[in-house]
């Protein structure tokens, strides 16, 4: 039964793009291509190190901007606003938690990776444990995760934004974006990716600030946001249910460990495990730190990215909540027929929160600017995935199949891999059109919680426990994969019920939150890996030199690039500056957590 209290049509056509908006979008794309071509021309593209790691000569500010831009692709840009609209502030924990893990990347994981002189993280695993089976396992797993979660999420979210704001053909707009992104990624390698990421990050932040100011103005400021959100109830609801009501704990970060949608226990422990995989062991992210001129530049880049990661609360999540307050019949819909009219999906439309704000609140010209914010977010994330996936396949799989391959062949294969990824991505579009944006975001998180914890466990043991060996790590990964894959299959067979329906899923799904499952999977993998390592011979000292935290012997003070002008005194000074900023950053982070607790 549906209750209907509506008095007007919530689906009346919204504002359309003007000529000025189109001009702004065109100018942005021209600028983006120009920066890509410029950085490609100045890049050392004819060597493997130059193409895949930017010649190990990147400075801190483009690294930090690229880290932020790569993590805030259009999938998360729209997803964070949508999650804010659906459940409130707690989703900001996915960004704020990154502060500590990014510092761990720079001070711990990055030091190990740079000292081991690796190009890919699978290469590090091969050096640390020996053999090839773990390296191949991680390379294939990373490629699959990139294609079926990262590219999928970004493509769907980007296409959703383009469809709502521009009305362009779904396939045409997606293929055009993929083509432009792949063009500068193929030609320029990591240098082009990092510099265009830096440009796109600047545009993202400026545009998001403007929209956030406009959104807060609509509700008379931050002080009115809680009350406005609490009143965001759609006119048509499902009788005898409460799913149309905004959450009572919407303004709190820490939520009940049993009944909360994002329990504080899971957000503290489970999310940290997943974030460690993403920021410290995922090729897409770590590749930026590996390109640093020296360790200080890697540290400063992580600090800059951490400061930027504090922004999504005010620039994406709160505007998402405001969008629901302003447009409850569309963003907050619960009746399947109403949701289908609003966004083409029956189980909810929270993911249209951000593009709805853009089209309704932004004036002529600025509306085009905001579209030029979302498109670079999509392109930034896709370019990162293309480049890193190309690196993985070329360096870890192709070079294994053809050990005598020349540098020219490796570079050609790397570029061809990007073309193949484009084809797979386009073929995946029909699947994305049949999926709900919210379901896709939850699916991505579930996949991460089911597949990432074993990788985090093995990397953590490999870096901090000298006794860990290949046999223990391999069997730990297999055990974790078996358990994680089982949960994924169950989730696919038993999707979450819609509003008003009984939850008949198995207890492992209905009673065990995916963030809590991540903790259990991490512990299981670690236990198997430790047991297997203790039952087999330990690695010898020379096998783990410069590969664990306790066996570092290489002096990193003069950087990864010879002749970069660093002196020990200058290096020490900037190391102290980085250390001070890291402490300040953690204090700021703790303050915000406490304020919104």
Curated annotation (Swiss-Prot):
Extracellular-facing ranges? 1-16, 95-100, 159-171, 220-265, 323-367, 432-444, 494-514
Supply one GO molecular-function term.
mannose:sodium symporter activity
Among InterPro entries, the record links this protein to:
Na/Glc_symporter_sf (IPR038377), Na/solute_symporter (IPR001734), Na/solute_symporter_CS (IPR018212)
User: Does the record bear Ribonucleoprotein in its keywords?
Assistant: no
The chain's Cytoplasmic topological domains, given as residue ranges, are 38-73, 122-137, 195-200, 287-301, 391-410, 466-472, 536-576
Q: Which residues are annotated with the PTM Phosphoserine?
A: 49
Q: What is its subcellular localisation?
A: Apical cell membrane
Provide the topology term for how it sits in the membrane. Multi-pass membrane protein
Q: Which UniProt keywords apply?
A: Cell membrane, Glycoprotein, Ion transport, Membrane, Phosphoprotein, Sodium, Sodium transport, Sugar transport, Transmembrane, Transmembrane helix, Transport
Where on the tree of life does the source sit, at the highest rank? Answer: Eukaryota
Give the positions annotated as glycosylation sites.
5
What parts of the sequence cross the membrane?
17-37, 74-94, 101-121, 138-158, 172-194, 201-219, 266-286, 302-322, 368-390, 411-431, 445-465, 473-493, 515-535, 577-597
Would the keyword DNA damage be found if you checked this record's keyword annotation?
Answer: no
**Gene Ontology CC: one annotated term:** apical plasma membrane
Q: Which reaction does it catalyse?
A: D-mannose(out) + Na(+)(out) = D-mannose(in) + Na(+)(in); D-fructopyranose(out) + Na(+)(out) = D-fructopyranose(in) + Na(+)(in)
Tissue note: Expressed only in kidney.
Task: Give the family this protein belongs to, as stated in its UniProt record.
Answer: Belongs to the sodium:solute symporter (SSF) (TC 2.A.21) family.
Q: Which PANTHER family match?
A: SODIUM_MANNOSE COTRANSPORTER SLC5A10 (PTHR11819:SF128), SOLUTE CARRIER FAMILY 5 (PTHR11819)
Give the protein's function. Electrogenic Na+-coupled sugar symporter that actively transports D-mannose or D-fructose at the plasma membrane, with a Na+ to sugar coupling ratio of 1:1. Transporter activity is driven by a transmembrane Na+ electrochemical gradient set by the Na+/K+ pump. Exclusively recognizes sugar substrates having a pyranose ring with an axial hydroxyl group on carbon 2. Has likely evolved to enable renal reabsorption of D-mannose, an important constituent of oligosaccharide chains of glycoproteins.
**Entry protein name:** Sodium/mannose cotransporter SLC5A10
The organism that produces this protein has a lineage beginning with: Eukaryota, Metazoa, Chordata, Craniata, Vertebrata
């Amino acid at each position: 039964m549906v209750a209907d209290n509506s008095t007007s049509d919530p689906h009346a056509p919204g504002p359309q793009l003007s000529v000025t908006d189109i001009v702004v979008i065109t100018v942005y794309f021209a600028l983006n291509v120009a920066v890509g071509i410029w950085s490609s021309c100045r890049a050392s593209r004819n060597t493997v190190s130059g193409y895949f790691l930017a010649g190990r000569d990147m400075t801190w500010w483009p690294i930090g901007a690229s880290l932020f831009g790569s993590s805030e692709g259009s999938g998360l840009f729209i997803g964070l606003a949508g999650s804010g609209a659906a459940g409130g502030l707690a989703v900001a924990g996915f960004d704020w938690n990154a502060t500590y893990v990014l510092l761990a990347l720079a001070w711990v994981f990055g030091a190990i990776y740079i000292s081991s002189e690796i190009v890919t993280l699978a290469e590090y695993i091969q050096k640390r444990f020996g053999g090839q089976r773990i390296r191949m396992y991680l390379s294939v797993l990373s490629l699959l995760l990139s294609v079926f979660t990262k590219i999928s999420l970004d493509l769907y979210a980007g296409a959703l934004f383009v469809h709502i704001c521009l009305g362009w053909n779904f396939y045409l707009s997606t293929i055009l974006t993929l083509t432009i992104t792949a063009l500068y990624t193929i030609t320029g390698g990591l240098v082009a990716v990092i510099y265009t990421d830096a440009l796109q990050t600047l545009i993202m932040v400026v545009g998001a600030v403007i929209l956030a100011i406009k959104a807060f103005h609509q509700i008379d400021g931050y002080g009115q946001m809680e009350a406005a959100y609490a009143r965001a109830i759609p006119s048509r609801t499902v009788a005898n249910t409460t799913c149309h009501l905004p959450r009572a704990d919407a303004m709190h970060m820490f939520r009940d460990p049993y009944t909360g949608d994002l329990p504080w226990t899971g957000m503290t422990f489970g999310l940290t495990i997943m974030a460690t995989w993403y920021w410290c062991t995922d090729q897409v992210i770590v590749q930026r730190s590996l390109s640093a001129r020296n360790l200080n530049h890697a540290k400063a880049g992580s600090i800059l990215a951490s400061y930027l990661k504090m922004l999504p609360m005010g620039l994406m999540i709160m505007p998402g909540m405001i969008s629901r307050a302003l447009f409850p019949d569309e963003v907050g819909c619960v009746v399947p027929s109403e949701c289908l009219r609003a966004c083409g999906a029956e189980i909810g439309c929270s993911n249209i929160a951000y593009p709805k704000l853009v089209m309704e609140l932004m004036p002529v010209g600025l509306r085009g600017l905001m579209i030029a914010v979302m498109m670079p977010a999509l392109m930034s994330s896709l370019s990162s995935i293309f480049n890193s996936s190309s690196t993985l396949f070329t360096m870890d799989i192709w070079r294994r199949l053809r050990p005598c391959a020349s540098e020219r062949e490796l570079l050609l294969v790397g570029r061809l891999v990007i073309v193949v990824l484009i084809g797979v991505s386009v073929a995946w579009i029909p699947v994305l059109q049949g999926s709900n944006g919210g379901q896709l975001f939850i699916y991505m998180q579930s996949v991460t919680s089911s597949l990432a914890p074993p990788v985090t466990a093995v990397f953590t043991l490999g870096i901090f426990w000298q006794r860990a060996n290949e046999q223990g790590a391999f069997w730990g990964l297999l055990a974790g994969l078996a358990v994680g894959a089982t949960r994924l299959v169950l989730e696919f067979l038993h999707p979450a019920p819609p509003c008003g329906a009984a939850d008949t899923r198995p207890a492992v799904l209905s009673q065990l939150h995916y963030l809590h499952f991540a903790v259990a999977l991490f512990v299981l993998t670690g236990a198997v890996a430790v047991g297997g390592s203790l039952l087999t011979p330990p690695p010898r000292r020379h096998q783990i030199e410069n590969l664990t935290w306790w066996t570092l012997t290489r002096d990193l003070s003069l950087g990864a690039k010879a002749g970069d002008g660093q002196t020990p005194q200058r290096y020490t000074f900037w190391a102290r500056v980085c250390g001070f900023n890291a402490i300040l950053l953690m204090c700021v982070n703790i303050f915000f957590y406490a304020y919104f607790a």
